[in-house]
Amino acid sequence: HMDKVKAEAEADLNNAKVEEVTDVNGLKAVKITFDSGLLFNTSSSELSAASKTNLDNLAKLMKKYSTCAIDAYGHTDNQGWRNSTAEQSAQKNLQLSQQRAESVVNYLKANGVASSQFKNVVGKGSSEPVADNTTQAGMQQNRRVEVFLYASEQMVKEAQQGTLN
């Protein structure tokens, strides 16, 4: 079932990285990574006009697979903010990452995705880099929003009973 979700996500989401991962229960999950440069202006949590096509397509996908559970995680690079201490910058990055994750989730909810599908919406700040923060390219990769689609308890039960569509 998650294979279908992954295939459709790859077809519908331009400029997003779609991967199959294993969730905490050892089940397949689909991880969709959006470069935050595609979604937001620098230092902003307001969605850009360009991001809305991708998010509209994601909303359609999530409504189609309405039994999927969803987590959204915001991430930033480790760059400091002007006139801020390292500690203040880390706090601002954490807040920004949380606001970005919430912006994505609120947009999806406004486009018909059920609130009950969202399980975790978390800002990680710069705590989980995927690339080197000493280069521009690396920092860009670290500024991202990750959306995980995974089997809800309902889907797991249906799969075990053989009733999952």
Regions found by a protein language model. Give the residues of each.
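Periplasmic peptidoglycan-binding/tethering modules of Gram-negative envelope proteins
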Residues: 1-69, 150-165
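Short connector loops/turns at beta-strand edges and beta->alpha or beta->beta junctions
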Residues: 35-37, 75-78
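A short amphipathic beta-strand at an alpha->beta junction
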Residues: 66-74, 80-81
